[in-house]
Structure formats: C-alpha cells, structure tokens
Regions:
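Active-site neighborhood of HAD-like aspartate-dependent phosphohydrolases
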Residues: 2-60
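Long, low-complexity, intrinsically disordered polar/charged segments
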Residues: 7-11, 15-16, 59-63, 68-72, ...
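Conserved phosphate-coupling serine/threonine residues in phosphotransfer and NTP-handling enzymes
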Residues: 14, 102-104
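Catalytic cores of large soluble enzymes that bind and process phosphate-bearing ligands
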Residues: 20, 50, 76, 147, ...
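Short, surface-exposed acidic
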Residues: 36-42, 67-71, 118-119
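Metal-dependent phosphoesterase signature
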Residues: 54-86, 94-96
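C-terminal cap/substrate-recognition subdomain and adjoining C-terminal extension
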Residues: 83-97, 104-226
C-alpha cells in the first residue's frame, strides 16, 4: 500500500543488519564462538524457539569476563550502512519521526548510533554483567495484543505505544525480528531475509540495499519535494 495518501508517517527502523551492514549479535557469536550457539541460532530462524529465549540463550553462553573484549570487538567491526547519515538528515529536514527499534543490545546500539542522533527514540534490549555469564534484560516486551509473546524487544508493541489512529507506519528491516512489525506496517522497506518472508507471506514491500535507496523510496511514496 502506498503511503502518499496517508497522514503522519512514523518511521520504525531496525538496527542490526539494517543500520549496520552486518548483524552484530551474529558477529559476536562467530568471533567468540561459544559451544552451542549455532544450534540456538537455527532454532530462532526456524521459529522453534522464541526470539527472546534464543537471544538470551546465546548470550548466556558467554562469560562476563569477556565483556570488554566483546564491546571493543563490536565497536571496531561494525560497519554503518551506506547513506545512513544522509537518511537521518533527510528525516529531520522532512520532519519525519524516526525511531530505532532493535533486538540488539544497549552496549553496542547506543555507542554506534551516538554520532547520528538525537533520534525520536531508541528501543533495544539491555545487558546485565553482574553474574557469571551475560544476562539479557528485556525492557520493551510484548503487550497483551502481541500474538507471539516471545519477542525480545517487541517491535509491534513499541509501534502500538507510539502511533495514533491517524499515523502511518513505515518499517525498515532485514530479518526475522522485523517480521511481526512488517505484518502491521503501512509500508515495508526490506532487504535480505525479510524479503523472503514478505514474499512467502504475501506482504507488499519495497527493496533496499543502501539508505540512499530508502530515501528515494520515501520521496516517491510520500511525494516529498526536496
């Protein structure tokens, strides 16, 4: 559905694999390679366990002693997707509310986004390093309306809290963690695995590779004149 005839667009943008070129959680797991993490990843992707349970399980395989090494590694290796800075500037220029809604973890989401902010809001999971292994905290869990009740950062619940009846939702994402949000969006801008799921389920989408593509899509859909 085109959004040019709808009012008050609000953008909900994923972080891992969307703002960043790679999925930072997967990058961490590949680098530190705790035994059993790949099995958990496959269970998340085939939806045999919830995203919340799976991501928590993966991080529980890592000792807290690795905290500094993990943080240093993820901040060094993360690559911001081409055009993101221009895209953020565009949303400010056009007065389009932009929320980052991420299944990622605060210790890398906030530092990586800091040069580009401020944003209208950043929603992500948190890490607790007080025990023997890394424990995840989920401050943005599912509301009563969520059908899965197993999200980590529940993107549809965040969207429902922010939107009014007059708002139009634009979801930008790449993975299984964006699927439930895509199902309720007025416009989906997708890449990678999310495209496969949209095609499988008959969800209309626009494809992107860089954030220059995203800006062009929004220009066309919203009828923005620069």
């Amino acid at each position: 559905m085109g959004v040019n005839n709808l009012s008050k667009p609000i953008i909900f943008c994923d972080f891992d694999g969307t703002v960043t070129a790679n999925d930072n959680i997967i990058a961490i797991m590949k680098k530190f390679n705790p035994p059993g993490w790949e099995t958990v990843k496959d269970q998340i992707l085939d939806q045999s366990i919830s995203i919340r349970e799976g991501v928590a399980k993966m991080f529980s395989l890592l000792p807290v002693e690795a905290k500094d090494d993990i943080i240093s590694y993820v901040l060094e290796q993360a690559e911001i997707r081409e055009g993101f800075s221009d895209f953020v500037a565009y949303t400010k220029q056009q007065q389009l509310p932009l929320y980052i809604v991420s299944g990622g973890i605060d210790f890398f989401v906030y530092p990586l986004l800091e040069p580009f902010g401020p944003f209208d809001g950043i929603y992500c999971n948190s890490a607790d390093f007080s025990g023997d292994t890394i424990k995840l905290v989920f401050p943005h869990g599912c509301d009563e309306t969520c059908t899965s009740q197993g999200c980590g950062c529940c993107k549809p619940s965040v969207m429902r809290r922010i939107m009014s009846e007059q708002s139009t939702s634009i979801v930008i994402g790449d993975s299984i963690t964006d699927l439930q949000a895509a199902k309720q969006a007025d416009l989906v801008i997708a890449r990678d695995f999310l495209i496969d799921k949209c095609e499988e389920l008959g969800i209309a989408y626009e494809a992107f590779e860089s954030f220059h593509d995203v800006t062009d899509i929004l220009d066309a859909k919203l009828g923005v004149i620069s």
